[in-house]
Curated annotation (Swiss-Prot):
Protein name (database record): Fatty acid metabolism regulator protein
Main localization (coarse): cytoplasm
Entries under Gene3D superfamilies matching the protein: GntR ligand-binding domain-like (1.20.120.530), Winged helix-like DNA-binding domain superfamily/Winged helix DNA-binding domain (1.10.10.10)
A GO molecular-function annotation: DNA-binding transcription factor activity
Subunit relationships: Homodimer.
Annotated ranges, domain HTH gntR-type: 6-74
DNA-binding region per Swiss-Prot/TrEMBL record: 34-53
The organism's place on the tree of life at top rank: Bacteria
Cellular component aspect of the GO annotation: cytoplasm
The keyword Transcription regulation appears for this protein: yes
SUPFAM superfamilies: GntR ligand-binding domain-like, Winged helix' DNA-binding domain
Pfam families according to UniProt: FadR_C, GntR
Species assigned in the record: Erwinia tasmaniensis (strain DSM 17950 / CFBP 7177 / CIP 109463 / NCPPB 4357 / Et1/99)
Length: 238
């Protein structure tokens, strides 16, 4: 087990999460007692207690007063906040994880983008027009792409879509820095934003879903072509 965290709390969190992932503390099992675990990891009980509370909030553990701390099946109890952690723990699974992320983005965005453009065109226009001033480099496009999808999610009038995008931000932006290093990806994205603006201006709302799905398909093709050059440390440890 190689742990790169620098603070005692970060080290303890990494240790416990990796132990759960590697089945040293398998789902359904009971964690060692606080004193034993703090000595095993090499941190104070106060630090360990804070870490355990944080991991419980993220769905890794169940803590009940007077009962031993139980390890959860995190797939069933955790939220989107653990995506970065999962990608870091198992680099081999990153391509599939990102494929799933792109698929989810396409499926939900075809709904909220259509709703935003049809129902709240002024808000949608304001979001999309930010694409007109973006600098042609990876970091700028990463921020822009996330901002546009998130902005349209909130502009749809259903804030739940925006909250989903909030939960995806960490992995979304880290992947984006690699993806948008490809000029073809930046050109495709800019064309997509302008296409949505044109649909908004012409009120050809029936074209929205196909436009979003086509962008999802073509961006997926670019991404698949870039996987061979994906950084080994796509997601650094905390």
């Amino acid at each position: 087990m190689v742990i790169k965290a620098q603070s005692p709390a970060g080290f303890a969190e990494e240790y416990i999460i990796e132990s759960i992932w590697n089945s040293r503390f398998p789902p359904g099992s009971i964690l060692p007692a606080e004193r034993e675990l703090s000595e095993l990891i090499g941190v104070t009980r106060t630090t360990l207690r804070e870490v355990l509370q944080r991991l419980a909030r993220d769905g890794w553990l169940t803590i009940q007063h007077g009962k031993p701390t139980k390890v959860n099946n995190f797939w069933e109890t955790s939220g989107l906040s653990i995506l970065e952690t999962l990608a870091r723990l198992d680099h081999d699974s990153v391509p599939q994880l990102i494929d799933n992320l792109l698929s989810v983005r396409t499926n939900i965005s075809s709904i909220f983008i259509r709703r935003a453009i049809r129902t709240y065109p002024d808000k949608a226009r304001e979001v999309l027009e930010t694409a007109n001033e973006v600098e042609d480099q990876a970091e700028a496009y990463t921020r822009l792409d996330y901002s546009i999808f998130r902005g349209l999610a909130f502009a749809s009038g259903n804030p739940i879509y925006g909250l989903i995008l909030n939960g995806l931000k960490g992995l979304y932006t880290r992947v984006g820095r690699h993806y948008f290093s490809n000029p073809e990806a930046r050109r495709l994205a800019q064309g997509f934003y302008q296409q949505l603006l044109n649909i908004l201006h012409t009120k050809q709302y029936e074209l929205i879903v196909d436009s979003v799905r086509d962008y999802g398909r073509r961006s997926g093709e670019i991404w698949h072509g870039m996987q061979v050059s994906m950084p080994t440390e796509l997601l650094p440890a905390r």
